């Protein structure tokens, strides 16, 4: 196949052309064929150097043009419609990094392969509606926004995924990478993605960002001039004496990046973190790099949200050796939270009766089919007891952490 034969959306910044991403076709049904088509059209496979823990991230060589809006009112109308879709998405789709974690394990065991890293290199990360991480949620939102075409012609073609690296310490060094992404890609893990729209209101330029993966229920607007409708700081969540605030702004060091500032206040003590979102070019390897990276991350969660992004119910746990513990939470006259052990679920009924009642309540509030959450937890328990598999998976995670440690 000749380079460049996939058109401008698949042209690469900092690397040779490679085919569009076609992994895991069989997981799609007619009901989500549009989502598959979107992935096929906008995603590719990155090249994978020998002994590197991840494929290399890739971006389109062409920037997206700004979507032209006639007035502030025109923009406000668009933002309000997108926000409704974001809120509906949060309510209808759980955030789920557990399902694909289990699928990877079960497929590995069926394969008969003993070397996890070799299998990991050949594995096509599936994107399914039941197992959406930040990647699937951003793609699902993009897919839904084609419904706005009647009111906002061409809007779908102006949307794109953008890549994010979290908790950056060396901001000036990182923002300088935009001029040499071809070599810098070796040190990037790109663990998060958002949906982005560049726009102009008359001659005023701005960005619209949507982040359903971090439960952000609003449309975030970032104006070059920082004037209205720039969003600025907002409270993302406030619970149990913990207040989390977000701010998104063009980086003063390099406007090809947006700084994502997070300010967390616990009992009066404040912590700050900064992530960097590369917005100059569409991100083409969200599935092959970001979703793949997520598969071996050492923290998993399955969460339901309301339209405002508030967490309703769920489970979460650390992935580490000799760990038998998970946390479950649900609503019952306020939020209830407790720790349980995976091993408890294999005990006689009398021992685990209380745990089963709580799991049933949580199952309902996650909107899962009856008995599904218990099945999921039993499968995770089996995985966590497989010491050889767990050790190999955590070794890959550690290799990725070492690779990106200097960012």
Spans of features found by a protein language model:
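Mixed-charge, low-complexity segments
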Residues: 4-76, 83-131, 135-139, 147-149, ...
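Active-site catalytic microenvironments in core metabolic enzymes, especially phosphate/sugar-handling
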Residues: 208-212
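Short beta-strand scaffold segments in enzyme catalytic cores
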Residues: 193-197
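Short, surface-exposed beta-edge/turn micro-motifs
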Residues: 191-192, 205-207
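Short acidic (Asp/Glu) patches
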Residues: 171-183, 188-192
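Short, solvent-exposed loop/turn segments that connect beta-strands within catalytic domains
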Residues: 152-154, 200-206
């Amino acid at each position: 196949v000749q380079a460049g034969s996939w058109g401008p959306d698949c042209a690469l910044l900092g690397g040779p052309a490679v085919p569009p991403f076609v992994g895991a076709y069989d997981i799609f049904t007619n009901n989500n064929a549009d989502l598959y088509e979107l992935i096929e059209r906008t995603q590719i496979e990155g090249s994978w150097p020998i002994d590197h823990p991840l494929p290399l991230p890739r971006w389109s060589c062409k920037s997206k043009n700004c979507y032209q809006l006639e007035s502030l009112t025109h923009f406000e109308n668009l933002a309000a419609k997108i926000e409704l879709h974001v809120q509906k998405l949060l309510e209808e789709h759980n955030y789920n990094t557990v399902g694909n974690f289990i699928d990877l394990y079960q497929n590995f065991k069926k394969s008969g392969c003993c070397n996890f890293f070799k299998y990991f290199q050949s594995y096509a990360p599936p994107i399914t509606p039941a197992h959406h991480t930040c990647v699937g949620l951003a793609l699902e939102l993009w897919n839904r926004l084609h419904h706005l075409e009647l009111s906002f012609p061409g809007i779908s073609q102006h949307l794109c995924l953008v890549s994010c690296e979290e908790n950056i310490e060396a901001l000036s060094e990182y923002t300088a990478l935009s001029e040499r992404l071809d070599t810098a890609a070796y040190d990037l893990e790109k663990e998060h993605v958002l949906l982005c729209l560049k726009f102009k209101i008359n001659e005023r330029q701005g960005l619209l960002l949507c982040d359903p993966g971090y439960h952000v229920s609003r449309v975030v607007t970032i104006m070059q001039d920082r004037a209205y409708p720039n969003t600025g700081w907002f409270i993302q969540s406030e619970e149990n004496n913990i207040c989390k605030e977000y701010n998104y702004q063009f980086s003063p060091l390099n406007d090809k990046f947006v700084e994502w500032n997070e300010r967390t206040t616990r009992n009066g003590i404040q912590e700050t973190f900064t992530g960097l979102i590369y917005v100059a070019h569409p991100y083409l390897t969200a599935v092959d790099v970001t979703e793949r990276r997520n598969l071996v991350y050492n923290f998993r969660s399955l969460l339901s949200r309301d339209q405002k992004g508030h967490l309703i119910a769920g489970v979460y746990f650390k992935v580490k050796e000799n760990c038998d513990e998970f946390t479950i939470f649900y609503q019952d006259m306020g939020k209830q939270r407790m720790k349980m052990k995976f091993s408890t679920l294999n005990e006689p009924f009398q021992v685990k009766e209380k745990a089963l009642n709580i799991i049933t309540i949580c199952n309902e509030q996650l909107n899962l089919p009856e008995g599904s959450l218990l099945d999921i937890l039993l499968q995770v328990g089996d995985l966590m007891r497989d010491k050889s598999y767990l050790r190999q998976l955590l070794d890959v995670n550690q290799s990725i952490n070492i690779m990106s440690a200097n960012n």
